[in-house]
Amino acid sequence: MLKVSARHAPVLRLPRRFYAQKTRVVIGPRLKNLDEIKEYLGKPTWSVEKYLQSSSNGETQPPSRETVEKLLKLSGLPNENVEMFQATLGKQLAFINKVQSLPVDESLDPSHARIIDRNSEALDYESLSCSVEQQETEKDSKMGEVGGSWDGTGLAAISENGFYVLREGLLKNRK
């Protein structure tokens, strides 16, 4: 059924099964009890400190002074403490090189690496308008929401059909 309202554009009302999507986020295998959770959290995989310590051994050279000065200029920072920035950037680059050289376990499912669904569909106007209409009709009484109870133009000096009326020009002595 097509409903035409003075406030909104025409909206096609469809049963929920036509536009509702069920999304479920799967991060990894489900842990069934407290012992499995403790076992999972008790297994250390790797330590950042281990790679930071090994990266400070001088395996990679820090960036040159000219490079650091150029980066400081691009970022708008003063050219003070260039040596400190040079050492810090050297440690960070060594750490990144270590992380990139780590062996990757190919048996792991790469879809578990993200929380957000990688295969999400584009949102179109119809599904957006239907979900807005659904939210308007399904107010939460626990939260004190009452459908149609708020009048956004109720305090306006001049309104017509639920819209504000704006006048152009100087508003001296006008009502």
UniProtKB/Swiss-Prot annotation:
Pfam families listed in its UniProt record: GatF (PF20977)
Subcellular locations according to the entry: Mitochondrion inner membrane
A GO term for molecular function: ATP binding
Transit pept. (range): 1-19
GO annotation, biological process: glutaminyl-tRNAGln biosynthesis via transamidation; mitochondrial translation
Catalysed reaction equations from the record: L-glutamyl-tRNA(Gln) + L-glutamine + ATP + H2O = L-glutaminyl-tRNA(Gln) + L-glutamate + ADP + phosphate + H(+)
Leader peptide range in chain numbering: none
EC annotation from Swiss-Prot or TrEMBL: 6.3.5.-
Membrane topology: Peripheral membrane protein
Keywords carried by this UniProt record: ATP-binding, Ligase, Membrane, Mitochondrion, Mitochondrion inner membrane, Nucleotide-binding, Protein biosynthesis, Transit peptide
Gene Ontology CC annotations of this record: glutamyl-tRNA(Gln) amidotransferase complex; mitochondrial inner membrane
Broad class of where this protein is predominantly found: mitochondrion
InterPro entries in alphabetical order: GatF (IPR027499)
Main function: Allows the formation of correctly charged Gln-tRNA(Gln) through the transamidation of misacylated Glu-tRNA(Gln) in the mitochondria. The reaction takes place in the presence of glutamine and ATP through an activated gamma-phospho-Glu-tRNA(Gln). Required for proper protein synthesis within the mitochondrion.
Subunit structure: Subunit of the heterotrimeric GatFAB amidotransferase (AdT) complex, composed of A, B and F subunits.
Similarity comment text for this entry: Belongs to the GatF family.
Official protein name in the record: Glutamyl-tRNA(Gln) amidotransferase subunit F, mitochondrial
Organism field: Lachancea thermotolerans (strain ATCC 56472 / CBS 6340 / NRRL Y-8284) (Yeast)
